[in-house]
Amino acid sequence: MMAEEHTDLEAQIVKDIHCKEIDLVNRDPKNINEDIVKVDFEDVIAEPVGTYSFDGVWKVSYTTFTVSKYWCYRLLSTLLGVPLALLWGFLFACISFCHIWAVVPCIKSYLIEIQCISHIYSLCIRTFCNPLFAALGQVCSSIKVVLRKEV
């Protein structure tokens, strides 16, 4: 009985990962477009003081801009949203696949192979460079610098 409940719970968890509910009100919950895509009328069109158009022109321009942007976005997202989502899903799946099955194993392989070389390199440094720099340090340790301020 307990094993069946555990299996049902696992099935629900796996299902929840792939069938995530989406928020239809807040469609940018991580605020990725907060600073990037800000295209309200006031962000694009502005009249400086002293060069105002007629109030009616300003109101109609505002309405035209807002409505045309709204419907153009809706039309483009209707026509291209699903194909582009498919394209981006495929692209990110390919990138994830390459990262998981090629990049990470190559890096791990490189780190394993470079570890052997690093031991040899470290041995060479300790054998040749350490005595050389220790001797140079002894030679330079007897150098004295005197600073005088002349007026």
UniProtKB/Swiss-Prot annotation:
Keywords: Cardiomyopathy, Cell membrane, Disease variant, Golgi apparatus, Isopeptide bond, Limb-girdle muscular dystrophy, Long QT syndrome, Membrane, Ubl conjugation. Changing S61R: In a patient with mild proximal myopathy. May act as a scaffolding protein within caveolar membranes. Interacts directly with G-protein alpha subunits and can functionally regulate their activity. May also regulate voltage-gated potassium channels. Plays a role in the sarcolemma repair mechanism of both skeletal muscle and cardiomyocytes that permits rapid resealing of membranes disrupted by mechanical stress. Mediates the recruitment of CAVIN2 and CAVIN3 proteins to the caveolae. Residues 64-114 are annotated as: Required for interaction with DAG1. There is a cross-link at K38 (Glycyl lysine isopeptide (Lys-Gly) (interchain with G-Cter in SUMO3)). Residues 1-83, 105-151 are cytoplasmic. It comes from Homo sapiens (Human). The gene is CAV3. This is Caveolin-3. Belongs to the caveolin family. It comes from the Eukaryota. One of its GO terms (cellular component) is Z disc. Homooligomer. Interacts with DLG1 and KCNA5; forms a ternary complex. Interacts with TRIM72. Interacts with MUSK; may regulate MUSK signaling. Interacts with DAG1 (via its C-terminal); the interaction prevents binding of DAG1 with DMD. Interacts with DYSF. Interacts with POPDC1. Interacts with CAVIN1 and CAVIN2. Interacts with CAVIN4. Changing L79R: In LQT9 and SIDS. Sumoylation with SUMO3 by PIAS4 may reduce agonist-induced internalization and desensitization of adrenergic receptor ABRD2. The keyword tRNA-binding does not apply. It is linked to HyperCKmia: Characterized by persistent elevated levels of serum creatine kinase without muscle weakness. It is a peripheral membrane protein.
